[in-house]
Structure formats: C-alpha cells, structure tokens
From Swiss-Prot:
GO terms for biological process: L-histidine biosynthetic process. Catalyzes the condensation of ATP and 5-phosphoribose 1-diphosphate to form N'-(5'-phosphoribosyl)-ATP (PR-ATP). Has a crucial role in the pathway because the rate of histidine biosynthesis seems to be controlled primarily by regulation of HisG enzymatic activity. Keywords: Amino-acid biosynthesis, ATP-binding, Cytoplasm, Glycosyltransferase, Histidine biosynthesis, Nucleotide-binding, Transferase. Its EC number is 2.4.2.17. One of its GO terms (cellular component) is cytoplasm. It catalyses: 1-(5-phospho-beta-D-ribosyl)-ATP + diphosphate = 5-phospho-alpha-D-ribose 1-diphosphate + ATP. It comes from the Bacteria. This is ATP phosphoribosyltransferase. HAMAP family: HisG_Short. Lacks the C-terminal regulatory region which is replaced by HisZ. Belongs to the ATP phosphoribosyltransferase family. Short subfamily. It comes from Prochlorococcus marinus (strain MIT 9215). Pathway: Amino-acid biosynthesis; L-histidine biosynthesis; L-histidine from 5-phospho-alpha-D-ribose 1-diphosphate: step 1/9. It is found in: Cytoplasm.
Length: 215
C-alpha cells in the first residue's frame, strides 16, 4: 500500500476525481461529516492523507507520502526536493502583482525603490523583483494581503488571482503576471526509485485519463 497526500480546500474535489479515474477512490474524504484525516481507497491499494495544500510538498519530501497533488504556486514557494511528475491542468490561477486602482503604477518598474510589497509568497515575490532588479521590501502576510495597499502599509501585493473579483471588490488591479499556476502531481524521489510499478502504473493511468479529458 502506498500513501498519497491530498490537499484540503479548492483542489480537493478535482484531486479525488483524478485518482478515481486512475482506479483509486477516496470519495469518502468529501463527506463533510467525516472528520478523519486518513482514508483508504476502495481497492485497498492506497491510503490518502488529507493535509493543507501548503503541507503537501513537506509530506512528500520527507517520505510520509509517496505521491501528492499541490498547486504550482505552493510547490515553487516551498523549494523542497520532490519529483515533479505531471501538470494536471486544474486549479488554474495567476500569480500576479497588483496595486491600488487609483495609483499611478501601471507596470512593475513604476514602483518606487525600496517600497513595501505584501505577500504570502515571500520567496516568489523576492525572486521576481530581484530578476527585475527592483529593490523592494517584502512584507510577509498570512491572511488577506489586499489589506496591505488598502491600509497604506504596502504599495503592492503579490498573490494568486483566479477571477479577479477579490481585487476588484477591494479597489485593486493587476499590473503584471508572474506565472500561471495549476495543480501538479509530485512524488517522493526515493519512493520513485524503489517503486515496484504501483506508483508508475498510477502515474501512467492519471496521465492517460487526463489526456482523454483534454481531447
């Protein structure tokens, strides 16, 4: 039996559908009355751990899970050593730079030197501004980063944007996209090397069923 780390939240339903098409059914994890954090597939070939999206790479990297599904945004921010296996295509959103709508900033280089930029993704934000050679101070927030510009604490934010509704409702606009993030299938490198084809068969099954959906 191998172990899979499933992300709580927005990616969970599509993650469960992905494994179900590959023959591993963890649908009981969707039962809101079920408080369990571990689930066996109906076929008893695999076990799932229900964890926070940001913790998926940790469980996979440390070997507590052989496979996992996580957003590319989290994967890129974590910088943990995992095998990057498949782009699953769902959960799409942009990592974006946004400012107040009534500001004078229309592109990244308009931002004043050493200004404050609020973000949950501090490594991603820092790397982005370093590549642009723009000196800024990254302010780490774990909640609603939109409050940074609203309160005047920050000139801009770096955050995930799906529909743009939250930005619009808070008087913010995008001025740049850093990258497009989708759900990714990842694996533990050692588990992949020691695999007796159970993981490989699952990965190939996911890849083939995903291709059929895209067609």
């Amino acid at each position: 039996m191998f172990t899979i780390a499933l992300p709580k939240g927005a990616l969970l339903r599509d993650s469960i559908s992905t494994f179900k098409r590959a023959g591993l059914d963890f649908s009981n994890a969707l039962d809101e009355n079920n408080r369990s954090l571990t689930f066996e597939s109906n076929c008893k070939r695999a076990k799932a751990l229900l964890v926070r999206n940001g913790d998926v790479p940790v469980y996979v990297s440390y070997g507590q899970a052989d496979l996992g599904i996580v957003g590319y945004d989290v994967l890129r921010e974590s910088e943990l050593k995992v095998a990057k296996l498949l782009d699953l295509g769902f959960g799409g959103c942009h990592m974006s730079l946004a400012v107040k709508k009534n500001s004078n900033y229309s592109k990244p280089t308009d931002l004043p030197a050493n200004c404050k930029v609020a973000s949950k993704f501090i490594k991603t934000a820092r790397s982005y501004f370093e590549e642009l050679n723009i000196p800024v101070e990254i302010v780490h927030l774990t909640g609603s980063v939109e409050l940074g510009p609203i309160t005047g604490m920050a000139e801009a934010i770096v955050d995930l944007v799906a529909t743009g509704k939250t930005l619009k409702e808070n008087g913010l606009i995008k001025i740049d996209d850093l990258f497009y993030s989708t759900a990714r299938l990842i694996g533990n490198p050692l588990s992949m090397r020691l695999d007796d084809n159970h993981l490989r068969d699952t990965i190939l099954s996911i890849e083939s069923t995903n291709s059929l959906i895209e067609e």
